[in-house]
Amino acid sequence: MKVTSYSRILIILAALVGALVVPLKAQDSQQDYVNAHNQARSQIGVGPMQWDEGLAAYARNYANQLKGDCRLVHSRGPYGENLAKSGGDLSGVAAVNLWVNEKANYNYDTNTCNGVCGHYTQVVWRNSVRLGCAKVRCNNGGTIISCNYDPPGNYANQKPY
């Protein structure tokens, strides 16, 4: 069978697209979300979280409701919740890292924040042991990441760990 120049170009393009798709999905798996959370938790001696498909379905359903305008509005549901967005693509691991970076704003001794730190405290909340997350592409090309936690955290006057 003779391969034409056009066929070679199509084969090369298919290989390139395949090579690009794999990295885009590389930090959005269930295990990627769990690992990113558990890495932050292990740094302070808090036990690991486990993936919960029911929480993931809740996160996916709610994130799909936000994709019209990509605005971050909390669901006010029964779970703890962290939301992140980007004007372009955002990986799940990058979203978790945004939340974990709020650790710099948290003072454990006084249990206070100097700026925003509630996303971080939810990630490391000792009693939150189940996790479910979703990534949704917004109509404007942006991305929303939603993670839900059970039991929820961030109770007033309680330390996360």
Swiss-Prot record:
Please name one Pfam family that this protein belongs to: CAP
What the protein does comes down to: Probably involved in the defense reaction of plants against pathogens.
Q: Which GO terms describe its biological process?
A: defense response to other organism; response to bacterium; response to ethylene; response to herbivore; response to jasmonic acid; response to salicylic acid; response to wounding
PROSITE patterns in alphabetical order? CRISP_1, CRISP_2
Write out the GO cellular component annotations: extracellular region
Tissues/organs with expression: Expressed in flowers, stems and roots but not in leaves.
InterPro entries according to UniProt: Allrgn_V5/Tpx1_CS, CAP_dom, CAP_sf, CRISP-related
Where is the secretion signal located? 1-26
What family is it from? Belongs to the CRISP family.
Q: List the disulfide bonds.
A: 70-138, 113-117, 133-147
Per the record, the domain of life is: Eukaryota
- Enumerate the spans annotated as SCP domain: 34-149
Where exactly are the transmembrane stretches of this chain? none
Q: Per its UniProt record, what SMART domains does this chain match?
A: SCP
The question of whether Disulfide bond is a record keyword is answered with yes
Keyword Chloroplast set for record: no
For this UniProt record, the keywords arranged alphabetically read as follows: Disulfide bond, Plant defense, Signal
Name-wise, this protein is Pathogenesis-related protein 1
Kindly summarize what the UniProt induction comment says about this protein's expression. Answer: Accumulates in root tissue in response to ethylene (ET, ACC) and methyl jasmonate (MeJA). Stimulated by the salicylic acid analog 2,6-dichloro-isonicotinic acid (INA). Expressed after wounding. Repressed in response to salicylic acid treatment. Strongly induced in response to the incompatible bacterial pathogen Pseudomonas syringae pv. tomato DC3000 (avrRpt2) but only weakly by the compatible strain P.syringae DC3000. First down-regulated early during diamond back moth (Plutella xylostella) larvae (DBM) feeding before being up-regulated after 24 hours.
